[in-house]
Swiss-Prot record:
GO terms for molecular function: gap junction channel activity. Residues 344-359 have a biased composition (Polar residues). It is found in: Cell membrane; Cell junction, Gap junction. It comes from Homo sapiens. This is Gap junction alpha-10 protein.
Length: 543
């Protein structure tokens, strides 16, 4: 029946350029079709015509009845089926060889270009390593001797699968129409020149029926493999697309990790820069580096001090607060306009609107800084925090909350508060506080005549409920700050009518207080003058 070596050699070449399902299909084609057909089926159909006998002596009747019973021999039918079903694979193999040749030329061109780059003495080590990896990859591709299944080659592969599937279905239908699923031993022939109906007998009908069912089963399995291969290619393409998408998202996550995943062990910091603060509200920081921007107009000086708590901006006149997060630096930049801008009443953060502004018991444990309002021509000021003591031992003296009230240009009362660190030597002067207390009676009558009062400028919570002291810059911890409620309330009421704004400025290793007094001249205007207590750097306020 001819030699199958040529067809087998070509199909073996196709085997190297197929998918795993395609290789299974080729294995079934080789073993269960070509081998079975050559070794066993030929002998079964060898005496097909000679053993076909009819009960008539009419010349030509046997030939006519045999031709009617077997329009085409099943052996030749199966050979044609193998050739036609394999022909799309041969076409694909031709295209694959063409692409392989073009791929080899491109590989040689790339290899020559990379070798030319290697001869350049100005290449750095990283570039040389990259070129070496590329050369090794090209050599590996040469050993594989295979073209990547993508692009037009992939389309050709899918097309050849569809074509052989259609041919497989066609041959299965043809075999069923010609012979069905069973070979009958008796065939009645009514073709002329046979007289009437002639009985003809088929040799080895049972054996032929078995081979017929076997070939039908192999054809059905081949068709199922073709369908599975199409699904395999589609699923693989979808998975490749999803993998590329997930890889790109992974790269984006690595290049830009979220802010909440960044952890820092450095001390918290506070920076003061230029903008107009409106309202300052507290936040709680957990071992993260934070930057707070509080604006001082006409000044480019920036102080950087430890910040135990985080500040954010929340406008008191209904404006929308905003903040900027820098994910790469791990800092929070808070832009705050002037805390005195607007004429609305002062409010303390962490309290409801119906709460008293002077009740320290109503303040939240996380709140440590309040807000104040004033005329828009007021001088801007910067609010800092105290630097924690470098001494890890507790000082035993609490911080004192001082409140002072004064009048603005409209006659409304203003209140300011500050924490005085008694543990620091020289943090305040006794003479200055004595003067403030002595002037209480003089300003008390003026403050009592005011019709409208605003909430505290700087309001601090109960530090007796503070969870734990925050670490200083040197890594030490300060002691728990305990508040003496009665002395604080007394001093707050004393400074409530003192008419002085006392503002703290803290630099690393320096504790500085600035007192701003407003004095009325004969015309009713207020003059600003500043006093610096225990100061190293001078601070100016521009009215």
């Amino acid at each position: 029946m001819g030699d199958w070596n040529l067809l087998g050699g070509i199909l073996e070449e196709v085997h190297s350029h197929s998918t795993i399902v395609g290789k299974i299909w080729l294995t079934i084609l080789f073993i269960f079709r070509m081998l079975v057909l050559r070794v066993a089926a030929e002998d079964v159909w060898d005496d097909e015509q000679s053993a076909f006998a009819c009960n008539t002596r009419q010349p030509g009747c046997n030939n006519i009845c045999y031709d009617d019973a077997f329009p085409i021999s099943l052996i030749r039918f199966w050979v044609l089926q193998i050739i036609f079903v394999s022909s799309p694979s041969l076409v694909y193999m031709g295209h694959a060889l063409y692409r392989l040749r073009a791929f080899e030329k491109d590989r040689q061109r790339k290899k020559s270009h990379l070798r030319a780059q290697m001869e350049n003495p100005d290449l750095d080590l990283e570039e040389q390593q990259r070129i070496d990896r590329e050369l090794r990859r090209l050599e590996e591709q040469k050993r594989i001797h295979k073209v990547p299944l993508k692009g037009c080659l992939l389309r050709t592969y899918v097309l050849h699968i569809l074509t052989r599937s259609v041919l497989e279905v066609g041959f299965m239908i043809g075999q069923y129409i010609l012979y069905g699923f069973q070979m009958h031993p008796l065939y009645k022939c009514t073709q002329p020149p046979c007289p009437n109906a002639v009985d003809c007998f088929v040799s080895r009908p049972t054996e032929k029926t078995i081979f017929m069912l076997f070939m039908h089963s192999i054809a059905a399995i081949s068709l199922l493999l073709n369908i599975l291969e199409i699904f395999h290619l589609g699923i693989r393409k979808i998975m490749r697309t999803l993998y590329k998408k997930s890889s790109s998202e992974g790269i984006e996550d690595e290049t830009g990790p979220p802010f909440h995943l960044k952890k820092y062990s450095v001390a918290q910091q506070c920076m003061i820069c230029s903008s107009l603060p409106e309202r300052i509200s507290p936040l709680q920081a957990n071992n993260q580096q934070q930057v707070i921007r509080v604006n001082v107009p006409k000044s480019k000086t920036m102080w950087q001090i430890p910040q135990p708590r985080q500040l954010e901006v929340d406008p008191s006149n209904g404006k929308k607060d905003w903040s900027e997060k820098d994910q790469h630096s791990g800092q929070l930049h808070v832009h705050s306009p002037c805390p005195w801008a607007g004429s609305a009443g002062n409010q303390h953060l962490g309290q409801q609107s119906d709460h008293s502004s002077f009740g320290l018991q109503n303040t939240m444990s996380q709140s440590w800084l309040g807000t104040t309002t004033a005329p828009r021509n007021c001088p801007s000021f910067a609010v800092g925090t105290w630097e924690q003591s470098q001494d890890p031992e507790p000082s035993g003296e609490p911080l004192t909350d001082l409140h002072s009230h004064c009048r603005d240009s409209e006659g409304s009362m203003r209140e300011s508060g500050v924490w005085i660190d008694r543990s620091r030597p020289g943090s305040r002067k006794a003479s200055f506080l004595s003067r403030l207390l002595s002037e209480k009676r003089h300003l008390h009558s003026d403050s009592g005549s005011s019709g409208s009062r605003n909430s505290s400028c700087l309001d601090f919570p109960h530090w007796e409920n503070s969870p734990s002291p925050l670490p200083s810059v040197t890594g030490h911890r300060t002691s728990m700050v305990r508040q003496a409620a009665l002395p604080i309330m007394e001093l707050s009421q004393e400074l409530f009518h003192s008419g002085c704004f006392l503002f703290p400025f803290f630099l690393p290793g320096v504790c500085m207080y600035v007192c701003v007094d407003r004095e009325a001249d004969g015309g009713g205007d207020y003059l600003w003058r500043d006093k610096i207590i225990h100061s190293i750097h001078s601070v100016k306020f521009n009215s």
